[in-house]
Amino acid sequence: MNILDELAWRGAINQVSDEEGLRKLLDKKSVGLYCGVDPTGDSLHIGHLIPFMMLKRFQEAGHRAHIIIGGGTGSIGDPSGKKSERVLQTMEQVHHNEEALTKQMKHLFGKDNITIVNNRDWLSKIDLLGFLRDYGKLFNVNTMLNKEVVASRLEVGISFTEFTYQILQSIDFHHLWKNNDVQLQIGGADQWGNITSGIDLIHKMEGSEAEAYALTIPLMLKADGTKFGKTAGGAVWLDPEKTTPYEFYQFWLNQDDRDVIKYLKYFTFLSQEEIADLEEKVKTQPEKREAQRRLAEETVEFVHGKEAVKEAEHISAALFSGEVKDLTASEIEQGFKNMPSVEVTAEPKNIVEWLVDTGIESSKRQAREDVTNGAIRINGDRIQDLEFTIDPSAEFDGKFVIVRRGKKKYFLARVK
């Protein structure tokens, strides 16, 4: 099967320039292709997974994947998808972000069939007069103004700096075409204009027979019409310090039945048969959420590894059952990151007083009532003795006390 057919089945193709020509090229040889990312932050988020999952599929199929870290383009800002001018970063920020993104890319793509480059290495060598003479003459301003990425900004205004972004991205494509034997650029749907500008530049500089292609991915929307990738808490990051593997796992586990098969096709390497089986289970046994569970397992393993999957599942099972005693300190940090927390001393104290002092209970009367009724669990154990003494240093390396009030309300007490 041609990889384009596989991508089409997975719903991963928005537009292709000269599909017939690209098909023939893919059948004939190992193709060089690339995707770029500007270092606007020090971590990728799940929105970045959309083009990079496609790049990974090409890599797995034996094609030569390239990633451009946009140290040059990132210093001026891509107007794509933005309603206003980007705030320029300091070069120190850009360098820091470049290093962080490169590390993440190496983790995701490994060492085989992957080349990571920085476009500052060649863009910084072009002087102003050379830029205007060698490249400026080849770009028609009317054509540039009609590109969606620019046209959408004309009413509110766009700086010359961001206006020229598509020229720099075109230079990138030409550079990789000439020096790295790269014939295909992939990107999000909003990158179509920038990518096709690069194809035009290659044809003008190398001749109309030069093989250069564009492939874009559809904008991914959820069943409710909102954009994929955002949560109430903001972006979902690939950096475990920003979004823990447990949070990452929960994000995928909580996907809507209407979306889960689409995400399994796009964000996993499961076969058509495996996904068809899970699709049937969504229809016949939706309450088991097997498709969501498999989606969470596959995505966490891809981004964080197998051990992270085990940890996330262990935390989920412990919080669901209330059996939290077996959690490690690291797992507690992950699982309780966004739950209410208080600081306490290591001093042992009567449970009623302790619950009121921590603010978990509003009054001693309420505390006594909840304890007596069995509504309070300390580190997984139901406590109904009003004379019980809490010793914060007794478990979890003396770092935490886990309190559950009722069936689902958790609190984390951190020992000072």
Swiss-Prot record:
Residues the record lists as binding L-tyrosine: Y34, Y165, Q169
The enzyme's E.C. designation: 6.1.1.1
Keywords: Aminoacyl-tRNA synthetase, ATP-binding, Cytoplasm, Ligase, Nucleotide-binding, Protein biosynthesis, RNA-binding
Top enzyme category: ligase
Recorded superkingdom: Bacteria
Pfam family, one: SYY_C-terminal
InterPro entries, per database record: aa-tRNA-synth_I_CS, aa-tRNA-synth_Ic, Rossmann-like_a/b/a_fold, S4_RNA-bd_sf, SYY-like_C, Tyr-tRNA-ligase, Tyr-tRNA-ligase_bac-type, Tyr-tRNA-ligase_bac_1
Motif ('HIGH' region): 39-48
Motif 'KMSKS' region, residue numbers: 227-231
Protein biosynthesis among keywords: yes
Primary location group: cytoplasm
A single BP term in Gene Ontology: tyrosyl-tRNA aminoacylation
Range of residues in the leader sequence: none
GO CC, one annotated term: cytosol
Cellular localisation: Cytoplasm
Reactions this protein catalyses: tRNA(Tyr) + L-tyrosine + ATP = L-tyrosyl-tRNA(Tyr) + AMP + diphosphate + H(+)
Molecular function, one GO term: RNA binding
Residue intervals of the S4 RNA-binding domain: 349-416
Annotated positions binding ATP: K230
Oligomer status and interactors: Homodimer.
Family statement drawn from the similarity comment of this UniProt entry: Belongs to the class-I aminoacyl-tRNA synthetase family. TyrS type 1 subfamily.
Main function: Catalyzes the attachment of tyrosine to tRNA(Tyr) in a two-step reaction: tyrosine is first activated by ATP to form Tyr-AMP and then transferred to the acceptor end of tRNA(Tyr).
Name the record gives this protein: Tyrosine--tRNA ligase
Species: Ligilactobacillus salivarius (strain UCC118)
Gene name of this polypeptide: tyrS
